[in-house]
Amino acid sequence: ASVTFWTLDNVDRTLVFTGNPGSAAIETITVGPAENTTVEFPGSWVGNWYAYPTDAEDVPGMLGEVQFGGWNGLTYFDVSAIVNPTDHDNVKQMWPAESRKPMSGCEVFPCDNAYWLPDDIQTKVTHEVDLWTTLGAGSTGLTF
């Protein structure tokens, strides 16, 4: 299982990972626009991540959330604004690497394709175990 992080602007960011109880710890990393960065996860990892500019204060923002190896071996994922809906500059979109469908999140926030309230029905599901996540302002040029 993996997530590839694609920085769309010129900002270096720190990525902080929080695993659910029983999930392995994933090291905090720094990513930037020079190249995409792929993080490997254990096959049944459940948790989330957020990003913040490396030269800024560590403030949790928009979350990328995932459950690898969930019910029937599926991957469940979403972009969540519940913790900090004012973060419009860090975690933006998530999608399965091969099919690129379904996509969660927004190229420009706010939109109706992310979790805003705890009872929103926004969790996406895929048979794939490799995902992409965009960071920062800009467009992938992909059509979802």
Swiss-Prot record:
Residues of the site described as Critical for IgE-binding: R100, K101
Glycosylation sites: N36
Keyword Hydrolase part of the UniProt annotation: yes
GO biological process: DNA metabolic process
Protein name: Antigenic protein SchS21
Influence of pH: Optimum pH is 9. No activity between pH 3-6.
Thermal behavior of activity: Optimum temperature is 45 degrees Celsius. Activity is about 80% of the maximum activity at 35 and 50 degrees Celsius.
Source taxonomy: Eukaryota, Fungi, Dikarya, Ascomycota, Pezizomycotina
Assigned keywords, A-Z: Allergen, Exonuclease, Glycoprotein, Hydrolase, Nuclease, Secreted
A single cellular component GO annotation: extracellular region
Keyword Signal: no
Enzyme Commission numbers on file: 3.1.11.-
Region feature (IgE-binding epitope): 91-105
Quaternary structure, from the entry: Homodimer.
Effect of R100A: Significant decrease in IgE-binding of the 91-V--P-102 and 94-M--G-105 peptides
GO MF assignments: DNA exonuclease activity; identical protein binding; protein homodimerization activity
Enzyme class: hydrolase
Purpose: Has exodeoxyribonuclease activity with lambda-DNA and salmon testes dsDNA. No activity with circular plasmid DNA. The physiological role of this enzyme may be to degrade environmental DNA, and thus mobilize nitrogen for uptake.
Cofactor(s) named in the record: Mg(2+)
Subcellular location: Secreted
